[in-house]
Amino acid sequence: MAMLGKRRPPRTANERVRRERGSATRRDDATADGLSIERLAHDGRGVARDPHGKTVFVDQALPGERVRVAVHRQRKRFDEAHVVERLATSPERATPPCAYYGRCGGCDLQHLDLEAQREHKRRTLDELFTRQGLTLPEIEVLAGEGLAYRRRARLGVKCDAEGTPHLGFRARGSEHLIDIDSCVVLEPVLSRLIAPLRACLVQLEAPRRVGHIELIATAEGACVVVRQLREVPGDEARWRRFAAEHDVTLAWRVGREAPTLRWLHAPRGEALHVTLVLDDTTLSLGCVPGDFLQINADVNARLVRTALAWLAPRGEERVLDLFAGVGNFTLALAPRVASITGIEGSPAMVERLADNARRAGLHQVGAQQSDLATQVPEVAAVDWVIMDPPRGGAEALCRALADSPVTTLLYVSCDPAALARDAARLVQGGYRIQRAALADMFPHTAHLESMLLLTRDTPRGRSTSVEREDHGQGP
């Protein structure tokens, strides 16, 4: 978001590095012969030890490489460093496909071969479960293209001292903006809008009133959502012209405290749609800007298809889909089971889930609103539970499920550490991990999506609606 009131030009990544490193940067004579990179940390940085045994995290260094480094941040237990000279190069090193890589903070693994990235993520998932005393079965890797995969992104906007607007992504670990003209991981329909959007910002009466710009690729084409901190009538007309000229849908999200969505160039029915391609059908999911959508449409479809294959429904199961969103798993599973109820915290998304089910003719779908951070739903009459919680996981839900009669659980997670923690609680409750998958939803980053199938033969007990003891806190 724009930092209002700051009267200075946005720093480039190089300026930021010089400022941060400044007096903190040092070259130890003891490391003149270089450090050997032993492994990758979970966040993708190389891990070495200096001659004194202190751990050093090295940006963009790979296992097997020997590097001379400069330390730019010293901590009590470890140092953080960057490469000054590479003395030996890993065969897994790749040429980054992006001209902005190393400055832009959007990607952090473009210097590593794509297959090696996936192996690193597989090891990360396995290590996190080992720390919990758990052994995973063979991890299936679900992967698609490495570039042009991202169907949603948020671009920062900032004006310099002269009032010139800049558009791009933040530098890694910083609020400083990296100006870009394109992005190789965005779907092309979105990437080619970046330069025209910057040109439009330059023409605005009040570009400082734009906080950020969100881009979404939908069945209707590209959608642009402008975070407008305050209405500017003249700029509204300019954005309308931009939408018409570039054949995009466009909305303002206006206001500071509780911004409202207002369409300036609306899709038919003021609803967008994304498609979910399954083996035997293609589903259309209605959504609006702000609804949760998986970033990678192709890998999301692979994830859902894998879930259906693992579960192998016979048409008689009663299913609960928690954190259901607009129906990603709910609608895919509905024709194959006796009944399925999607539960979601957002009332608006619950309405869209119900509408999506009606449009698809799926009468066995129920949609309910519930704050799953504070309330565990009734599961006594349920055979299967599916859940795809936010990054913090679902610790309270897993405690309740461990003592419930549910025998089959499909758990999708965007945080492998939270998944490992929750899986340990479920295993204590008698579940067994039957299948595991890594979904490479975010190629060229250290982020990973994962999925488990857990089953047990004998239920632990009867379940009722259970209030969390720490009422009011998130999962």
Swiss-Prot record:
Q: What is its EC number?
A: 2.1.1.190
Task: Extract the ranges annotated as region (Disordered).
Answer: 1-33, 455-475
**Alphabetical list of InterPro entries matching this protein:** 23S_rRNA_MeTrfase_RlmD (IPR001566), NA-bd_OB-fold (IPR012340), SAM-dependent_MTases_sf (IPR029063), TRAM_dom (IPR002792), U5_MeTrfase_fam (IPR010280)
Catalytic residues at 414 (nucleophile)
Presence of the UniProt keyword rRNA processing in the record: yes
Out of the domains of life, which is the source? Answer: Bacteria
UniProt-annotated binding residues for S-adenosyl-L-methionine: 294, 323, 328, 344, 371, 388
Purpose: Catalyzes the formation of 5-methyl-uridine at position 1939 (m5U1939) in 23S rRNA.
Under the heading HAMAP family, the entry gives: 23SrRNA_methyltr_RlmD
Describe the family membership recorded for this protein in Swiss-Prot or TrEMBL. Answer: Belongs to the class I-like SAM-binding methyltransferase superfamily. RNA M5U methyltransferase family. RlmD subfamily.
| Protein name as it appears in the record | 23S rRNA (uracil(1939)-C(5))-methyltransferase RlmD
| Gene source species | Chromohalobacter salexigens (strain ATCC BAA-138 / DSM 3043 / CIP 106854 / NCIMB 13768 / 1H11)
